[in-house]
């Protein structure tokens, strides 16, 4: 469900950084949903292909987060979540002197499929099994 | 309208596979709308730039489908459509042992333009002409 | 806020073209919001990775515009804006014989963060300061 796209200057993150970041982002979501829901795409961009404010961006990280499995129940919940994400990102971005921007879009739960299955609703027995087994399987409840 | 982005391991699809997949995806939509509405982008991703569940993804295909020209009229219609898409994808993905995930987002019809034209509403005379000619042209109806 | 992704054939735009386009796009948004809100990503795509209507696309430019900071207040406002964008693009796309398609999606204002800040509402004193200084800073109003 969450699909992250991280646009970044080619030299911003090492392969180790990327693996760590993906793991830590997955930990945040994994506290409430199956870990295999979390996709993270890194898109290195040369400054000639990436502009912020009309200027080539060689110190900027832009993150797009598509949420499907969960909707924020309130503004406060979204603030807590985004603050936590900013804290996870800090050692890799802010602390290295990069600027960054992120936004979340929410897309329809019903128009989503994994390995041909339609994912179970949050906190159902089926989702609990998907989470425990960390893989999709046929639903046993409607 | 539909814009598909297919994130995949670099070796997952040959050029022939990609051309076939694009053709078959276009056939599905082309049954009800102009074929030239259908855009398909393949994005090969090295495992160090693509993580699922916090692990490098070398056997995973992630598909994002942006729908503009049509909204699903019902849950049942969306199920039929997504099941059909999963069947079209199977020989290229499931049958080769890849895991895959897809989701659809719907974006506003009115904020869409092709070659400077605003596309006609579904099933109007203008859309029928666009479809028959497989190209955009000035609208003759409001 | 606006994040543009411009999918284009590798040879469609020179580096000078890209810098000019990013500047002109930023000028349009900069008339009403901070210039640093504007992100533009160029994604060159080989024809074997980019299909329109089921055919490899070597003369097609596809633009995705994600809007966060402002929502269109009316259909008329969206038409004026998109017409203006099409006019800005024309010398680089239509006048060179390329086909093109664009669409706008609007995503939630509240789920957006820049350098750890939550951007101020349109036309507030805080936004005016962000615009005048062309950088984010701590909000002084709720």
Locate predicted features.
Chain A
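A domain-level signal for the structural core that forms small-molecule/cofactor-binding pockets
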Residues: 1-142
């Amino acid at each position: 469900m969450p699909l992250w796209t991280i646009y970044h200057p080619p030299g911003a993150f090492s392969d180790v950084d990327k693996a760590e970041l993906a793991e830590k982002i997955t930990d945040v979501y994994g506290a409430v949903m199956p870990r295999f829901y979390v996709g993270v795409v890194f898109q290195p961009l040369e400054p000639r292909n990436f502009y912020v404010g009309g200027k080539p961006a060689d110190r900027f990280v832009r993150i797009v987060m598509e949420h499907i499995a969960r909707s924020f129940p309130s503004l406060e919940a979204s603030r807590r979540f985004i603050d936590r994400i900013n804290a996870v990102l800090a050692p890799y971005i802010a602390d290295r002197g990069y600027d960054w921007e992120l936004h979340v879009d929410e897309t329809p739960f019903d128009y989503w499929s994994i390995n041909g299955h339609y994912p179970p609703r949050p906190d159902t027995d089926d989702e609990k099994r998907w989470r425990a087994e960390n893989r999709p399987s046929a639903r046993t409840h409607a």
